[in-house]
Amino acid sequence: MKDLLNLLKNQGPSDEFDGIRIGLASPDMIRSWSYGEVKKPETINYRTFKPEREGLFCAKVFGPVKDYECLCGKYKRMKHRGIICEKCGVEVTLAKVRRDRMAHIELASPVAHIWFLKSLPSRIGLLLDMTLRSIERVLYFESYVVTDPGMTTLEKGQLLTDEQYFEAMEEFGDEFEAKMGAEAIQQLMKDIELEREAQEIREQIPNTNSETKIKKLSKRLKLLEAFIQSGNKPEWMVLEALPVLPPDLRPLVPLDGGRFATSDLNDLYRRVINRNNRLKRLLDLNAPDIIVRNEKRMLQESVDALLDNGRRGRAITGSNKRPLKSLADMIKGKQGRFRQNLLGKRVDYSGRSVIVTGPTLRLHQCGLPKKMALELFKPFIFSKLELRGLATTIKAAKKMVEREEPVVWDILDEVIREHPVLLNRAPTLHRLGIQAFEPVLIEGKAIQLHPLVCAAYNADFDGDQMAVHVPLTLEAQLEARALMMSTNNILSPASGEPIIVPSQDVVLGLYWMTRERVNDKGEGMIFSDIKEVSRAFYSKQVGLQARIKVRIDETIMEESGESESSYRMVDTTVGRMLLWEIVPKGIPFEMINKPMVKKAISAVINFCYRIVGLKATVIFADQLMYMGYDFSTKSGSSIGVNDFEIPEAKAGMIERADAEVKEIEAQYASGLVAQGEKYNKVIDIWSRANDLVAKSMMEGISKETVKNKQGEDEEQASFNSVFMYADSGARGSPAQIRQLAGMRGLMARPDGSIIETPITANFREGLNVLQYFISTHGARKGLADTALKTANSGYLTRRLVDVAQDVVITEQDCGTDEGLSMTPVIEGGDVIESLGDRILGRVVARDVIRPNSDEILVPAGTMIDEKWVERIESMGIDEVTVRSAISCDAVFGICAQCYGRDLARGHRANVGEAIGVIAAQSIGEPGTQLTMRTFHIGGAASRASAADSVEVKQEGTVRLHNIKVVARESGELIAVSRSGELALADAAGRERERYKIPYGAVITVKEGEQVKGGSIIAKWDPHTHPIVTEVAGRVVLAGMEDGLSIRKQTDELTGLTTIEILDPSERPSAGKDLKPAVTLVDENGNELKLANSEQPAHYMLPGKSIFSLKNGDTVGVGDIIARIPQEGSKTRDITGGLPRVADLFEARKPKEPSILAEISGTVSFGKETKGKRRLVITPPNGAVLEDGSTHYEVLIPKHRHLTVFEGETVAKGEVVSDGPSNPHDILRLKGVEALANYITNEIQDVYRLQGVKINDKHVEVIVRQMLRKVEITGMGDSSFVKGEQVEYIAVLQENEKLRAEGRQPARFERQLLGITKASLATESFISAASFQETTRVLTEASVTGKIDNLRGLKENVVVGRLIPAGTGLAYHAERRRKREDQAGSKAGSDTVSAAEIEAALTEALKSSAS
């Protein structure tokens, strides 16, 4: 019997599915979903509140209003289940079928679906090859369209106005057919022969020349192919039957007072039904054509409004003047179905309350109020009460719990034991915003939170609230404990640094106890061990900060994991010994034997985690906290006004600055300096004064002189509370102290520019009215910024999560040896990020080889941990190629090797880790700390004057990077290349400094030369751009005629004559074609050739250049022929902060981007046009370019400053004209790696300025997603269309297949999409639709019959399955395996016959009847 029932069950549809397909519904399909037709616009009877028959809420069509009860009341109860009442026609079943039973409306005339008409690009328009305007004219009954031309001169699809139609009727009679309205459009679409049309277009494309035409044709071809492949029929874009939403999804609720609250959809449906019925009646009456036509148009409009109100014409409004919410509005936007109900749901078994500190808790605990716990764990308590026999039924158990009997509390204790709960604080900006804790029952009503996890939650105790959630199933509890427990989340996933780090009071306490105090009680005592020290301290024989000697037992952990301990005598203080008591074995004493500022504490915790392990670290962190609180209490440290000591020298400094400013004002008044220069100088003076005041204030506050044991003066760090707060990193910073005790300094206006009157007072002295006003002026902007910032930052995070949500680690190793080459980030003389920091936790892509030999230092595939970093730093390696997400070859997701270390755990990433979301959160979470403002270069910002030399900071060896030089006779080198760099390496061979060297700079050192720190090794004139000779010879001038192409000037003081070349625009017409040039010849007058090339030494002189040689002068190598004055490049605002990050990720083109050379070759200038210069690049040796031309031309606006001049050679991708970089150009000309480096460095610059650490690999994951599309440039033998956008991986796979078959692969170009575009271009339509532009995405997906394979996380959340990441990845893999096994076994088993099913049915019915 059971087998038979199982057999029946197995025949039904299964819940297992692996994809969702969206398509167009045919009219028959709509009717097949329907349970009946809605014929009347009535909803419910206002007296009886019963639904009207055949109305919008009809019980006969949609099902009963009450469970198992028909409308007239004849059948009630379960036993009549399935019977249809003969009186009212209602099926007796559950009332919830009213949530899924649909109905339909038979439309009297077909109606075009507005989505396919108006959602751009219009699908109907594309298919019929008509403009949207003309289709609308037909649909809304303004024109006729010819549907069948017959044997006439008319064409199919031609529009006719009324007059033209009547004329044609007279001329041709019934030969042709023309219609209007949706019927006409439907007819035209029925007549399309998809296959033939597609074939015709395929033949047309190769014979078409114009780009736009090809684009148009390929768009149409794609659409036609989509229809052919998906099995959708074009005529289904016109509705014949309109589906009606189940009534419980558009409810009508009676309010008190006899009014009803209703969903807007009911209004919209009523309109459609009314018009439809009226149209039916008019058609039955054979009404005049014009009336019928009008009614049809109104029907079309009312269906449009139902589907997407406001898409065409004015939106239909309700009684409250608001537009009605149509079906399209129900699914889109933050309040729509996707974001409100599918991606974000409310959760049962949860509660929220205010949080307070729990300084006595352990790290894995939280205090849960008893009242809350009782409510949250109710079901567990009920089952326990029943199990123990304390309550007979659930109802009795419920009563016991409500009465709060004593036994209930005992049971609650048991239930809660080791049952973790999740705590969440909104906004949840990264994954550490939800962590698991073990609850500890407490009295009161507030949740207690462990202070160390506040940093992760970004929580404080000023009234923040948190939510508690209970994981119910055993698996959920297990995951909460193993993965989400606060003790397992010590490191931040963004940077890999500890995030469980003491702050504020705790830091202060630890700092205070580890400070030294000169001549404290018991100084100089010697102790044998820790115990003796603590006995002496607690019996008050020795002060906490006394300097003493102690014999300690120190354990050092070896790399191999062995540890060895040793005894030694150390100089230390009592407080440090007390701290040493709680430090785990394996940490060297040196890490503790210093004042413990916040950074030092963080370093200890980090070291402890890496060397000693997780468990010890957690215990240690807790002990640190308890001890810190204890001693910060004991320190009694507090501040009063007198702690802010104002330096005596302040008044004098301000007076001096004032005097300087007055002097400049006087110069300005007499016209010696310009307005801008005065402003900059004044601001410079005040910034300097402010720094000096701050310096003397910090000196006064941070040191104090005391008498020591010997009675001599000794200087020690001050015990001033304010200084201690700032020095320890507990609270405040020198900048804040400066405002309290120094001077407030310069203030900014809301637009970011600096006010030149500074505030000379500080907060201790108090501000006067003017000063107060100046402060508020810029401060208000700050507050407004903060509000905007939060929203913008949230939106950035949302876009990032959306673009990266489907990146999961899917395999161990993809086997590529590609990667990014990593070098230290050096700006000028500072190493901003060392190579070690950049490659830590990455996998080496290719063997690292010792310079100048073939010894392998680091084999490929090595994961670089802290030990390796030390080794690599000591070997003097400068560059390592590491595996990267960008170059990973995995088809879906990324492999573990390319990703490297899981930052939050410190070991190689596991398969299933959702790295995309982690990357998005790591970049988005600090977003609120970034600024919103654009910095104006002005005042304090522009103090760096134009550099004119390179001064090295430390000694080292000089290295030249792609600098072309010529040597003068004196031995100096002159740079004759643009993008050259000069670097300084230390003794180990690591680069420590790096400087850009401009063209024409004089370099006084050679490659490999040793230089001392402070020596100047290169200099140049920042205001002119020289033209340098590369060979020696005699000068021959050409094309120089005074007054036509040049102007002579004689300096009155020196009597020297200089020649200025006139700009072509300033020359008289006779001189336009003259090309002033200098040619170098040898003694015999033969032209000299440049070294290593066949080109003559011929230097063109550009306009505005100044030149002082005469015919026949001799010049040496490296001499300057002419100088071109540089106008100061315009000061640009630098966009900083959040807008800059958004610009980079959206891959926006800057306003005036730098222009790069498209090919390598020689530069020359062609004929100028009005306002533009023509730059011509000729490839060397007469090579021919891909498009068959012999050179490359580009027009550049005249106002752009060019960095190249005539006759110079440039390399592909070199900058020709300055400006902000355009990432698309970098990708096209320099490749993926250069682009990755550019975006990573630019984004890191923004975050570094705010002191935020983010690992490079997060940015790389996002960049990988931005690069996932390519544009097809050549079709080859593939099925792709030229100009279409395809997934990179898809093209690679297709090309591999084609190569294997020996056919022509497709050619393509990588494309860079901004994150919004990339999210919308994802393969999954569910993910794209739930992100933005829902209507457009769904329209496109349904026309092309897209299948969503549910690969990403978002799609799976929407359809309510486990996500394919973490434990879900294994679950899905297992499911797939099972299904494949079943498919294999099923093929062998025999099929079920109809007879067997019938037998089983009768059997089953008998058993249920008995």
Curated annotation (Swiss-Prot):
A Pfam family per the record: RNA_pol_Rpb1_5
Keywords for this protein? DNA-directed RNA polymerase, Magnesium, Metal-binding, Nucleotidyltransferase, Transcription, Transferase, Zinc
GO BP, one annotated term: DNA-templated transcription
Q: Which InterPro entries match?
A: DNA-dir_RpoC_beta_prime (IPR045867), DNA-dir_RpoC_beta_prime_bact (IPR012754), RNA_pol_asu (IPR000722), RNA_pol_N (IPR006592), RNA_pol_Rpb1_1 (IPR007080), RNA_pol_Rpb1_3 (IPR007066), RNA_pol_Rpb1_3_sf (IPR042102), RNA_pol_Rpb1_4 (IPR007083)
What's the superkingdom here?
Answer: Bacteria
- Spell out the reaction equation it catalyses: RNA(n) + a ribonucleoside 5'-triphosphate = RNA(n+1) + diphosphate
Q: Which residues bind Zn(2+) 1?
A: C70, C72, C85, C88
Cofactors, names only = Mg(2+); Zn(2+)
GO CC, one annotated term:
DNA-directed RNA polymerase complex
Q: Report the protein's function.
A: DNA-dependent RNA polymerase catalyzes the transcription of DNA into RNA using the four ribonucleoside triphosphates as substrates.
What this protein is called in its record is DNA-directed RNA polymerase subunit beta'
Taxonomic classification, please? Answer: Bacteria, Pseudomonadati, Pseudomonadota, Gammaproteobacteria, Cellvibrionales
